[in-house]
Amino acid sequence: MGKRKANHTISGMNAASAQGQGAGYNEEFANENLTAAERQNNKKRKKNQ
């Protein structure tokens, strides 16, 4: 069969598709630095704190 790309991702949104990014959550801001308040409430990093 071979590997298939996941159907639930939005094409062009993220190169690493279907890798737990939350399907388009916050990818457009991935390169910007977060403020202190955003860093406290960052959904991607909350499990690592």
UniProtKB/Swiss-Prot annotation:
It holds the Pfam family SspO. It is found in: Spore core. The keyword Transmembrane does not apply. InterPro entries: SASP_SspO. One of its GO terms (cellular component) is endospore-forming forespore. The keyword Acyltransferase does not apply. Induction: Expressed only in the forespore compartment of sporulating cells. Residues 8-20 have a biased composition (Polar residues). Residues 1-49 are annotated as: Disordered. One of its GO terms (biological process) is sporulation resulting in formation of a cellular spore. Keywords: Sporulation. Belongs to the SspO family. This is Small, acid-soluble spore protein O. It comes from Bacillus cereus (strain AH187).
